[in-house]
Swiss-Prot record:
Species the sequence originates in: Rhizobium meliloti (strain 1021)
Name of a matching Pfam family: TolB_N
Function summary: Part of the Tol-Pal system, which plays a role in outer membrane invagination during cell division and is important for maintaining outer membrane integrity.
Coiled-coil residue windows: none
Subunit structure: The Tol-Pal system is composed of five core proteins: the inner membrane proteins TolA, TolQ and TolR, the periplasmic protein TolB and the outer membrane protein Pal. They form a network linking the inner and outer membranes and the peptidoglycan layer.
Protein name: Tol-Pal system protein TolB
Signal peptide: 1-28
GO cellular component: periplasmic space
GO biological process: cell division; protein import
PANTHER family the UniProt entry points to: PROTEIN TOLB, PROTEIN TOLB HOMOLOG
Domain of life where this protein originates: Bacteria
Length: 436
């Protein structure tokens, strides 16, 4: 892990109090209450960072991140009156207020003598005439996009009061080829679709990739050698290993919150039950024991409870149990069937796929089953995954016809549904924790 941090990221954030980049008092006027649902996006001016093409690319990614969140409306640069030539100078606030820029971002990117980039920015509340935030970062030039995502996260958090989610990655199943002979391989990308690369390269079917809590491993299911098995993949080295050598099919894996166990389904004699495997001792523990199909387990953030799907009542429904398998209780009672549950990182909600009336929906409910809300419905929506701040979901959608699945994101309130750009067809997304 330390090698990965040294060789890949090489990134250091410095809060520069000594250079005057100090956050203003907490009573600045600019704020967004993201609990209100369909909020009006905040007009924000994001100037081209000085100096050069790379600096402008960084400010462009920042603007794209904030716009995609649905909470910010970057103002067209053609409307800017003041042309920033000195990021250290106090802006002419009247020039920004007249175009209704309630917040202003200015910045600069320079190259140090050792080759590193130095990226710095300031966030201003134009109507209060106060600086809200100022930071600077050092990184290797190849990591410029990550710096942009980190700055966007800082702006998002300062204005909304919630952690951002832009400095994250998505692992997913990349699909190519005709529908009746589709090739599926694991791929990974930034949350905005950039920096995509394949993690596997074979004709074996792969499904349900999931990140470890430290983002260094992925667990997934593969049909390698015609035997469905759960695997672990080390992202840094590419090394793979089978999680247990069981006589039956293993599938639907997911890490425990502490990363020490993998929970999964094991199919034997026509039914499937939920097991955990300790990754150090390789010992397994059986958690369910029914003649049904119990699958898609997901831990609560504190690791004390597990939500899963089961058809023990005749059709797929959601159940919650203790981490030791105790107290198995059904929580879904609406029309239709429920599947692919996943617990929110905040612990307050469970997202799911619901099939009813010939359509598939993505929804959320509280862990006791109350407060069910459908966020989006279509021909085939499936496989929700949470952003690490628990405010945004990603899922995949298959439309009717000969095309393939695509990834979409949607706000927890059901607004701001957006297509996530990928190089080809994509399914089974999983959101990483925030990078460090």
């Amino acid at each position: 892990m330390e090698m990965l941090r040294r060789n890949f990221f090489r990134l250091l954030m410095v809060l520069v109090a000594g250079c005057g980049l100090i956050a203003s008092p907490a009573n600045a006027l600019v704020e967004i209450n993201i609990n209100k649902g369909n909020v009006e996006p905040l007009p924000i001016a994001i100037t081209d960072f000085l100096q050069g093409e790379l600096a402008q690319k960084i400010s462009g990614v920042i603007a794209a991140d904030l716009k995609r969140s649905g909470l910010f409306a970057p103002i067209d640069k053609g409307a800017f009156i003041e042309k920033i030539s000195n990021p250290d100078a106090t802006p002419r606030f009247e020039d920004w207020k007249v175009i209704n820029a309630q917040a202003l971002v200015i910045g600069r990117v320079t190259q140090e003598g050792d080759g590193r980039l130095k990226a710095e920015f300031r966030l201003w509340d134009t109507f209060a005439g106060q600086q809200m935030l100022g930071q600077q970062f050092y990184t290797q030039p190849e990591n410029w996009r990550r710096v942009a995502h980190i700055i966007a996260d800082a702006i998002y958090e300062r204005i909304t009061g919630e952690k951002g989610y832009f400095d994250t990655r998505i692992v997913y199943v990349a699909e190519s080829g005709p529908k009746n002979a589709r090739k599926r391989q694991l791929a990974i990308m930034d949350q905005d679709g950039a920096n995509s690369r394949a993690l596997t390269n074979s004709n074996d079917i792969v499904l349900t990739p999931r990140f470890s809590p430290n983002r260094q491993e992925i667990t997934y299911m593969s049909f390698e050698n015609q035997q469905p098995r759960v695997y672990l993949l080390q992202l840094e080295t590419g090394q793979r290993e089978v999680v247990g050598n069981f006589p039956g099919m293993t599938f639907a894996p997911r890490f425990s919150p502490d990363g020490q166990r993998v929970i999964m389904s094991l199919q034997q004699e026509g039914n499937a039950n939920i097991y955990t495997m300790d990754l150090r001792s390789r010992t397994t523990t059986r958690l369910t024991n029914t003649a049904a199909i119990d699958t898609s387990p997901s831990y609560s953030p504190d690791g004390s409870r597990i939500v899963f799907e089961s058809d023990r009542g005749g059709k797929q429904q959601l159940y919650v149990m203790g981490a030791d398998g105790s107290g198995q209780t059904r929580i879904s009672f609406g029309d239709g069937s429920y599947s692919t549950p996943v617990w929110s990182p905040r612990g307050d909600l469970i997202a799911f796929t619901k099939q009813s009336g010939g359509k598939f929906s993505i929804g959320v409910m509280k862990p006791d089953g109350s407060g069910e809300r459908i966020l989006t419905t279509g021909f085939h929506n499936e496989g929700p995954t949470w952003a690490p701040n628990g405010r945004v979901l990603m899922f995949f959608r298959q439309n009717a016809g000969a095309g393939g699945p695509q990834l979409y994101s949607i706000d927890l309130t059901g607004y701001n549904e957006q297509l996530v750009q990928t190089q080809g067809f994509a399914s089974d997304p999983a959101w990483s924790p925030l990078m460090e």
